[in-house]
Amino acid sequence: RDFTHTIIDNSDLFSESRNTRLG
């Protein structure tokens, strides 16, 4: 896995976490 892909995955996890908190 390349560095760019890792950043994208981290962004997705962060967005998903925020959405869960918002309900």
Curated annotation (Swiss-Prot):
A single GO cellular-component term on record: nematocyst
GO molecular function: toxin activity
Protein name: Nephrotoxin PsTX-115
Top-rank taxon: Eukaryota
UniProt keyword terms in alphabetical order: Nematocyst, Secreted, Toxin
KW Secreted (keyword) present: yes
Protein localization: Secreted; Nematocyst
Regions crossing the membrane: none
Organism: Phyllodiscus semoni (Night anemone)
Biological role stated in the UniProt entry: Nephrotoxin. When injected intravenously in rats, causes severe destructive glomerular changes. At 24 hours post-injection partial disruption of the glomerular basement membrane, massive thrombus formation in glomerular capillaries, severe mesangiolysis and infiltrating cells were observed in the majority of glomeruli.
